[in-house]
A protein has these predicted regions:
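Conserved catalytic-core segment of NTP-binding enzymes
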Residues: 58-163
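Conserved beta-strand segments of alpha/beta enzyme cores
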Residues: 19-21, 146, 166-168
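N-terminal phosphate/diphosphate-binding loop that engages ATP/GTP or pyrophosphate donors
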Residues: 1-31, 35-38
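Glycine-rich phosphate-binding loop signature in dinucleotide/nucleotide-binding domains
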Residues: 43-50, 74-75
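Switch II (G3) loop of P-loop NTPases
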Residues: 23-28, 47-64
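Active-site regions of enzymes building and remodeling cell-envelope glycoconjugates
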Residues: 160-173
Length: 173
């Protein structure tokens, strides 16, 4: 999958103590919704805290589906819908809700929260993120899910301090 960019930061993640498990074909033009067998330890080893990036559509969620029985049995998971109103398929809360439901149906797991990730890549400003607050509120009302946090690149986040609750500044790789 050419869009799986986490693999680009493998050395930085490993240096920070993060064990990256990625598909064999990550960062290639092969787009298979599959994860390696070693990913099972994420649901089998209860001492681990795992973050899984399944992508922004139902195709990535199919790969998650194999873990659904383990996650539902435990009931100890958080699955966030990372919403960006600047993307073509989620420009309105209604479109975002449709994508959300498609992902849930494909993976067999319900979302538990929403993350405001409004961005225009390197053109993002604090105003870009703040303009998405009403969108996120409406998506929250429509879905019945809370807006868990707002994520933004570090320099953008600096302009959001005190303006949005639960701000997560991110360093882009």
């Amino acid at each position: 999958n050419p869009y799986f960019r986490t693999k680009d930061s493998a050395s930085e993640l490993e240096a920070a103590g993060v064990d990256l498990i990625s598909p064999q074909f990550a960062n290639t033009n092969v787009d298979l919704p599959a994860l390696p067998a070693e990913a099972y330890r994420l649901v089998e080893d209860k001492s681990l805290y795992a973050v899984m990036d399944i992508g922004g559509d139902d195709r990535g969620a199919y790969a998650l589906g194999r873990y659904t029985p383990f996650l539902l049995e435990e009931g100890n998971y958080r699955m966030a819908f990372v919403a960006n109103p600047c993307r073509p398929l989620t420009r309105t809360p209604e479109e975002a809700l449709e994508v959300m439901r498609e992902i849930e149906a494909a993976g067999g797991l319900p979302f538990t929260a929403i993350v405001n990730n409004a961005n225009l890549a390197h053109e993002t400003t604090p105003e870009t993120v703040l303009a998405a607050v009403p969108y996120m509120k409406k998506l929250s009302e429509m879905s019945g899910l809370p807006v868990w946090m707002t994520s933004a690149e570090e320099t953008v986040a600096a302009g959001l301090t005190g303006k949005v609750p639960r701000l997560l500044p991110m360093k882009l790789q």
